[in-house]
From Swiss-Prot:
GO cellular component, as recorded: membrane
Pfam family of the protein (one): Sre
Protein name: Serpentine receptor class epsilon-1
Transmembrane segments: 28-48, 56-76, 102-122, 144-164, 172-192, 232-252, 268-288
Protein location: Membrane
Entry similarity comment: Belongs to the nematode receptor-like protein sre family.
Domain of life: Eukaryota
InterPro entries: 7TM_GPCR_serpentine_rcpt_Sre (IPR004151)
């Protein structure tokens, strides 16, 4: 049985100094997880208030809740690692572990599947947004997010069981995770350039009798969202690649026997990567695209929380008064009025020339 568990309160004499250092860091990790609970509530609030499509928001909230699942599992594991909760020596030798420790490992493995699949989930959501481009903003089509999240939950649950009971080598599972990240990134790029090329074709006044204003608007929105998701997918893929290498090494039984000290530090590095992954993903989501950055800064609660942290870096954005928030219908009508005025000017010029 493979557990995400590496006790540091009781180590061999030659590793006591190293274990003691990691022992105190684990206490810091517990504190960081307590701080992350309210900080990610801020992210959930911003996601609910975001101007994205219902399905994209739903998938984002699903992934955020998946991180809370990881926090629960990791918190319980940390208590076992520092000795607040203990495993009997004879039980550890016979690989008989308490149920809370087993469940906490399952929760952590489940989140690893979520981290690998987030890019694929948003890529498929953008696929449906591209396929139903004419009516995607008008109809929520909740079945898309429910279908993706349901399939995603089953896949992550199965992968967690496979990794826990070592049904497949960790190297195979790590390769599969990296492959999914790379494949979703390529799939995403194809969708991005499909939307970009189609919008460019429309803007060049080709097939004007086929395309409507709603198609123009939706393609423009798709490209804005994809600019943000491009950074998310790229960062997720790179992070998954690094974490896959670390996980494969320190979960290898032969590596544990040959390099116990390196295994201890790799386990420590993996946990650091998970913490950094969540914080950096938050930064990327909020600060990647100026339009969305301005939107998040217009939320009063977000401005109060983030100004002490990033106010100097984005003084121009924070110095502006919060923008008036429009509904999707208002934004759509404003966009259509602008396009209609441009078309009217063009047709007036054509009529003048014909006269």
């Amino acid at each position: 049985m493979n557990l995400q568990y590496s006790p540091v309160f009781k180590c061999p004499p030659e590793m006591v100094t190293h274990c003691q250092w990691i022992y105190w860091f684990t206490h810091f990790e517990l504190l960081a997880m307590i701080i992350e609970i309210p900080s990610f509530l801020l992210v959930i609030y911003a996601t609910i208030k975001s101007p994205f499509h219902y399905n994209l928001n739903f998938i984002g909230l699903f992934m955020l809740l998946g991180y809370y699942v990881f926090l629960v599992g990791r918190f319980i594991t940390c208590l076992y690692e520092i000795g607040s909760l203990t495993v009997k020596d004879e039980d550890a030798e016979n690989e008989i572990y308490p149920m809370p420790l087993i469940l906490s490992s399952i929760l952590q493995f489940f989140y690893m599947g979520c981290a690998c699949g987030i890019s694929l989930a948003v890529a498929f959501e953008r696929f449906f947004a591209t396929y139903f481009v004419e009516t995607y903003e008008k109809k929520k089509r909740k079945w898309i997010s429910l279908f993706l999240c349901s399939e995603f939950t089953v896949a992550c649950g199965v992968s967690a069981i496979v990794m826990l009971y070592d049904l497949l080598p960790f190297a195979v599972m790590a390769f599969l995770g990296v492959f999914i990240s790379c494949a979703s990134f390529l799939f995403y790029l194809v969708l991005f350039y499909m939307n970009k090329r189609r919008l460019h074709t429309i803007q060049q006044d080709r097939d004007n009798d086929v395309y409507t204003l709603s198609v123009r608007f939706q393609l423009s929105e798709n490209l804005k969202v994809m600019t943000l998701l491009r950074n998310v997918v790229l960062f997720s893929g790179v992070n998954n690649f690094v974490m896959a290498i670390i996980l494969t090494m320190y979960m290898s039984k032969s590596f544990k026997v040959s390099y116990p000290l390196a295994t201890l530090y790799l386990h420590f590095a993996f946990n650091c990567c998970v913490l950094l992954y969540s914080f950096l993903m938050l930064i990327i989501i909020i600060f990647s695209v100026k339009q969305y950055r301005m939107y998040y800064f217009s939320i009063r609660f977000v401005r109060v929380v983030l100004y002490p942290l990033v106010g100097r870096c984005f003084q121009n954005e924070f110095s502006q008064s919060p923008v008036q928030q429009l509904t999707i219908r208002d934004e759509t009508e404003s966009y259509f009025v602008n396009l209609s005025s441009q078309w009217d000017e063009k047709f007036q010029k054509i009529n003048r020339l014909s006269i």
